[in-house]
Swiss-Prot record:
GN (gene name): PYL6
Protein source organism: Arabidopsis thaliana (Mouse-ear cress)
SUPFAM superfamilies, alphabetized: Bet v1-like
GO molecular function, one term: signaling receptor activity
UniProt-recorded name of the protein: Abscisic acid receptor PYL6
Entry keyword Membrane: yes
């Protein structure tokens, strides 16, 4: 079964990273800082650590969620890299249309409409990174009707250790930085964003594992 690890409330795989982040004054910082959100995690390739290094402003919060998937990297990436079709695994997405570009080239922009019940209607999201070789994808929110202003997400996919029966496992790491809305604090903002990210990655894991079984 897929398991997720929420950064602020981590278990075994992220304990070292959690300790590292506690040393950052990210709840009270007064200036811009650079934060590596995977530092201290075991078996993290260098390019993954670099990808999850963010510049964080004094009115922003940040977090990272880790998801292990019992499926090959290629299967996970084939789903995750479809910038034009996030609703394949993001159940909070009602529809998505690419309004600029082809959905593959950096600079492409998609309009994402979300299901009712969320404090948002739609968002405009720009593709910042699409690296098929290193399996890195990143997008930033550049407009829309929502409360997550200046949201930037980076997601990486890399091969993890094999499990007891020799099957390949994949580790998905998603980190983000976002402005804290007026009237909210950093803990509230990260808690909300973490919940969405965690649900998305759990759904991604289930889809990839089911796809892998029949491939």
């Amino acid at each position: 079964m897929p398991t997720s690890i929420q950064f602020q409330r981590s278990s075994t795989a992220a304990e070292a990273a959690n300790a590292t982040v506690r040393n950052y004054p990210h709840h009270h910082q007064k200036q811009v800082q650079k934060v590596s959100l995977t530092r201290g995690m075991a078996d993290v390739p260098e390019h993954v650590e670099l990808s999850h290094t963010h510049v964080v402003g004094p009115s922003q919060c940040f977090s990272v969620v880790v998801q292990d998937v019992e499926a090959p990297v290629s299967t996970v990436w084939s789903i995750l890299s479809r910038f034009e079709h996030p609703q394949a695994y993001k159940h909070f997405v009602k529809s998505c249309h690419v309004v600029i570009g082809d959905g593959r080239e950096v600079g492409s922009v998609r309009e994402v409409r979300v299901v009712s019940g969320l404090p948002a209607a739609f968002s405009l999201e720009r593709l910042e990174i699409m690296d098929d070789d290193r399996h890195v994808i990143s997008f930033s929110v550049v407009g829309g009707d929502h409360r997550l202003m200046n949201y930037k997400s980076v997601t990486t996919v890399h091969e993890s250790e094999e499990d007891s029966d020799g099957k390949k496992r994949t580790r998905v790491v998603e980190s983000y930085v976002v402005d804290v809305p007026a009237g909210n604090d950093k803990e509230e903002t990260c808690s909300f964003a973490d919940t969405i990210v965690r649900c998305n990655l759990q759904s991604l894991a289930k889809l990839a594992e089911n796809t892998s079984k029949f491939s």
